[in-house]
Structures are given as C-alpha cells and as structure tokens.
Amino acid sequence: MKGLLTRREFGTTIIGSLAALPLLAGEKSKPSVFGGTQIGAQSYTFREFKLDRMIEAMVSVGLSSIELWDGHLNPGKTSEADFKTVRKKFDDAGIKVGAYCVNFPVDSKDDYLDRGFNGALLLGTNVMTASVQKSIIPRLDQWCQKYKVKLGIHNHCFSDKWFKGDRTKEFETPNDYATALKGASEYLSINLDIGHFYAAGYDPVAYIREHHDRIVSLHLKDRDKDAEHSHRRFGQGATPIAECMQLVKKLKWPYVANIEYEPDPKDPTPAVRDAVEYLRRVLS
C-alpha cells in the first residue's frame, strides 16, 4: 500500500450501509484458482469503493478470494452481527475471505485486538495481515496464540517519497522479518509484498524459495526499475511477478496471492481485470 498513514488511518466512511441491497441472485464470481494457486485481491485496491460496489467489481473480473482491509471493515466499529452480515455478502457472491487485514496501532487496547482477531474468525478465516510497527509484535504474537490465528506482517519500501517516519520502527528488510520471528510462535508469519520488496532492493523469488513455509499472504504489484519504482500494470514493470508465481505453483504454496493495485483508485477495475488475465496466463 502506498503510505502507512493511508493504510492505517484511512477513513471508514466507505463501508457504507451493511443493509444495502445484495447482489442479484446467481451473481457469483468464477473461481480464481489458476494452476492450483488461489488468486485474490487486497481490498485496499478498491479503497474508494463501498463494500457492495467492490463485491460487484470482484465478481465482474472473476476473483473468488479477498483479503479484507480494515478501511472497509473497521473492527472497532463493527458488531459481531455485522461481521456475519459481511461474510454472508461475500459468500453469496462466491468470494471467500482469505484473510482479514487490521493495521493495529502501537497503542491498541486489548479490546481492539480482541475485536480484530475475533472478527477474522467471524469472517471465516484464521489468517490476518497487518502493517504495523515492530514494538507491537510481541503483543500480536500473544493474540495469535490466544485465537490460533496466523498473522502475516506486511513490508514496505521506505525509500518512497511519501515516507516521513522512522524506518527502524517498520518492516522492510529480510533482517526485519528474521528479528521479529526469532523466538516467536508458529502463528506469527509474513505477508510479503513482492513489489515493495523488489523496490527496496531485495529478491522476492529467492526470499519466497527460502521462507515460503512462513509466508501466509502475498501481495502482488508490479513496480518498475526507474528511480521512483513506479507502479505499473501487471507485466509492464520490473517486479518478477511471473517468476514468483511460477515458484509458488511449483511449491504448491497453500495460501492466497492477492492483487494489490495502487494506481487508479477511483476505478481500478480495468487494471485488475488485466492482472487476473496476466496471472491466469502465467500460471497456466
């Protein structure tokens, strides 16, 4: 995702009314399992869409899995009944919630952690992802063990111009992951963003090969080799998406690889459709 502030603190008004009209009967997404690999979308891709419009877009492009971002469903403002309502919306559309993304602030209260982890279970998944600072990791590991939920830590590229914080507090490098996971429970895991990893100067193919057993979510984006590491449509940048996906297929990696397309937030649907077709070809 483009910025930590954007990702962690994006307004929750886009959730819309959970009582809105459902999709028409029979409108279900086609399965998006290509070559044995489940492809989905990180809902930050559709960050300017309300929930129902996002579901419609996913059905239209043929995606059957979602990593649901807390900008679409804030655990602090969502009742258990509403979590169940949202899950039913996705179920009715043929979309499984593969992971729940909650970007826990460092000062999160215990109740907020409980609501986030319990929310994942209510959505039907035992996988979470989070863009967080290092200091909260020990607490998150405790909650992972409490709820038996695997939580993948998200990485960024902090040479990006938008970043103004202290990169030593964040996750970017292989060593950042190694330090956090050392001595942690089996539930604390990795959410590898291959585009950010490439832009930060690291080889995502080699990292997946060595650490795939600890990765529970992939974020797929195509960043280029120019000075800005610009975001491109899939297949037009320099990120080794095809190589990563072919390796994942070979390894029979059991989790979801999620498209996270950051440009065109007003309507990313055409680019996401292209990404789905690109991945279908790569994995065929």
What do the predicted segments below correspond to?
Residues K2-G40, R47-G62, P174-L192, Y198-S284:
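Histidine-acidic metal/acid-base catalytic patches
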Residues I14-I15, A20, P31-V33, R53, ...:
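Active-site acidic/histidine proton-transfer and metal-coordination neighborhood
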Residues T45-R47, D70-H72, N103-V106, Q133-I136, ...:
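Active-site-proximal loop/turn and secondary-structure-junction residues that shape catalytic pockets
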Residues L68-T85:
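Glycine-rich, proline-tolerant flexible connector loops at the mouths of alpha/beta enzymes
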Residues H72-N74, S159-K164, D226-H231:
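A short acidic, helix-capping loop that chelates divalent metal ions and anchors anionic groups
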